[in-house]
């Protein structure tokens, strides 16, 4: 008996998955310890697409800034964790890592917050 060929319906092309991540730098920018434009430039130079930094894959990854929020949009697989890694690298480079931390405040956004050190020190002083 001859093998039976199954008819498989071929699906159309998958629509491009657009990933959109936001970095909220409102607090440090308002306090004047960080420059959002400088951070945006850092991301443009450092984000790697296909193993190459600097060119953003010819428009595959775009970075936009509105006041103190930076939005990274990607049409290729892009990790949110990679964005956190680059943000921490920027903070370390500018000696801000001791005061700021990167916190996920939603599924597709990060926020830069201050460490809550002052409250702990005040509580310790009250106990003495």
Swiss-Prot record:
Gene Ontology molecular function, alphabetical: heparin binding; identical protein binding; RNA binding; structural constituent of ribosome
Segments crossing the lipid bilayer: none
Pfam family, one: Ribosomal_L22e
Example GO BP: translation at presynapse
GO CC entries: cytoplasm; cytosol; cytosolic large ribosomal subunit; glutamatergic synapse; nucleus; postsynapse; presynapse; ribonucleoprotein complex
Modified residues (Phosphothreonine): 62
Subcellular localization: Cytoplasm
Residues the record lists as Phosphoserine modifications: 66
Modification sites for N6-succinyllysine: 69
Location (main, coarse): cytoplasm
Keywords: Cytoplasm, Heparin-binding, Phosphoprotein, Ribonucleoprotein, Ribosomal protein, RNA-binding
PANTHER family per record: 60S RIBOSOMAL PROTEIN L22, LARGE RIBOSOMAL SUBUNIT PROTEIN EL22
Function as written in the Swiss-Prot or TrEMBL entry: Component of the large ribosomal subunit. The ribosome is a large ribonucleoprotein complex responsible for the synthesis of proteins in the cell.
Family affiliation: Belongs to the eukaryotic ribosomal protein eL22 family.
Protein name (Swiss-Prot/TrEMBL): Large ribosomal subunit protein eL22
Organism: Mus musculus (Mouse)
């Amino acid at each position: 008996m001859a093998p039976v060929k199954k008819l498989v319906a071929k699906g159309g092309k998958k629509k491009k998955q657009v990933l959109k991540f936001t970095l909220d730098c409102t607090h440090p920018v308002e306090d004047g310890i960080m420059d959002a434009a400088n951070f945006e430039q850092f991301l443009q130079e450092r984000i790697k697409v296909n193993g190459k930094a600097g060119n953003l894959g010819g428009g595959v990854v775009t970075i936009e800034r509105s006041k103190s929020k930076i939005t990274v949009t990607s049409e290729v697989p892009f990790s949110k964790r990679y964005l956190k890694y680059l943000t921490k690298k920027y903070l370390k480079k500018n000696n801000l890592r001791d005061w700021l931390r990167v916190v996920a405040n939603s599924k597709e956004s990060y926020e830069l917050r201050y460490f809550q050190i002052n409250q702990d020190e005040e509580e310790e002083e009250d106990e003495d």
